[in-house]
Amino acid sequence: MRLTDAISIRSRRRKLALFLDEMRPAEATTVLDVGVDEVSLGEGGGQSGCTTHNFLEERYPWPERLTALGLHDGTRFRERYPRIAYVQGDACSLPFPDASFDVVHSNAVIEHVGGRERQAAFVDEALRVGRRVFLTTPNRWFPVEVHTRLPLVHWLPESLAGRAYDVVGKSWARDNHLLGPADFRSLFPGAVEIRNLGLTLVAIT
């Protein structure tokens, strides 16, 4: 296992432990996981190199109470996780009625949905369909950018960072919109607790 994958898995274990401790789900708790991937834990990581996809789906004790939402058609996801309901849809326009779930969970998705307007819509939708939310995102002020594995480049102005990504063959990183603690908090219209775990920020309502 690569060191970066080991760090990622450790981070996700920490977030899962925090999720279980803060949300205290029980067997009857309904959970929506927004932004799942078609590939599963340990499979190829695509552009980001990440091999820790769908960590909640792999570890959650009551999969029958999970609903997963993703952009893909879900064929491989359903094969891998037959006990979990899968819905294809847009995280910024969720196809569910108000208060459909006890908890909305999303791990490191909000930085991929677009700029601040789309990110605000993402938060609004999570708050609309969930009685509580648990959202995570990489911390912009951590010195290593988790998607590219590059140090400090993401602290540059976006135009300069974009050029640097182009030079090293990571132009796809231009589409990542990272958040610092104040940025993350500003997306919530009401009370929210922002936990700074160093590498990761967690928003809890």
Which role does the model predict for each range below?
Residues 132-159:
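Conserved class I S-adenosyl-L-methionine
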Residues 204-205:
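Active-site beta-strand termini and strand-to-loop segments that position acidic
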